[in-house]
Amino acid sequence: GGYYGYPYGVVGAVHDTPEVAAAKAAHFAAVAAAGGAAAVPLYGGAYVGAHDDGQYHPGLYGDEGQYHSHYDGGYVGYAGGYDDGQYRPGLYGDEGQYHGEGYAGHYAGPIAGVPVIVNGVPADTPAVAAAKAAHFAAHAHAAHY
């Protein structure tokens, strides 16, 4: 025991308030009810209605199933599709310079969390602390202190 019956030095589980417990129950009931709903496709539906019938269909990708290397003349790219070993400034729009973009600083301060007291027990909110003070004052008044 402890002062006014408050357990001292006991680390116990934190329980939900009745309001939080009711909100959790309503949330899980809604999740369970939504579980029976029709599933929605997770992609944009680019292939809606198309299926694989197991047959070969030529020209599906415009290449008739043939392999084309990058050097067969069909490739249209920079300098005819091959590297001739020459430097060309501005190929990527940065003139080959490193500017340090993409590495924004990150927050390295303390992690925001629940204020705690001894042994990691969560501290009371101001409203709870005021209610406890009023409660203990009422007990003291009833005991004629």
UniProtKB/Swiss-Prot annotation:
GO terms for molecular function: structural constituent of cuticle. It comes from the Eukaryota. Keywords: Cuticle, Repeat. This is Cuticle protein 5. It comes from Blaberus craniifer (Death's head cockroach).
